[in-house]
Design a protein with these regions (language model features):
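Non-catalytic accessory regions of SAM-dependent methyltransferases
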Residues: 1-150
Length: 150
């Protein structure tokens, strides 16, 4: 007879937590009861309410339910699917702040993982903020026996 494993109940939603920084994958980072919490949709400096999505031994994950005090770099996402598909996780942050955050992530990774600190950092090359992703890749297979292309 197999044992049924019960799904662990998630803690109650939290209100009024301050976001300290941004993770490498664009989630807000806060600390609660000595544990890191990675919160989707939160920006550094914001005060937010969030609900838990998962709890782990070393960290928790959550999603913003309300922004009580917005960051000055928060903007209205242009994509109607923002927050659903995951393709543009920083669209709620103005583009200059996105570039700065990504550059800081690169420098942190060089320092901590590569044990390298660059002497100089060149200015970032930028292009248009919107409409630059125009490439699509589709898989096609010719099935000779069926006389079709899948």
């Amino acid at each position: 007879m197999s044992k049924r494993t019960r799904r662990k109940r998630l803690p109650e939603p939290v209100s009024g937590i301050t976001i300290e920084s941004l993770s490498h994958d664009g989630r807000g980072v806060a600390h609660l009861d000595g544990k890191a919490v990675f919160i989707d949709g939160a920006l550094p400096g914001e005060v937010v309410s969030f609900e838990y999505r998962a709890t782990r031994r070393r960290f928790d994950e959550g999603r913003v339910t309300a922004v009580m005090q917005a960051s000055p770099v928060r903007v209205q996402p242009r994509c109607p699917h923002f927050g659903l598909c995951g393709g543009c996780s920083l669209q709620h942050m103005e583009s200059a702040a996105q570039i700065s955050a990504k550059q800081q992530t690169l420098l942190d990774n060089l320092k901590h993982i590569g044990k390298v600190v660059p002497q100089t950092v060149l200015p970032v090359l930028t292009g248009p903020v919107w409409g630059y992703r125009t490439k699509g890749r589709l898989g096609v297979k010719d099935v000779i026996k069926k006389g079709r292309v899948l």
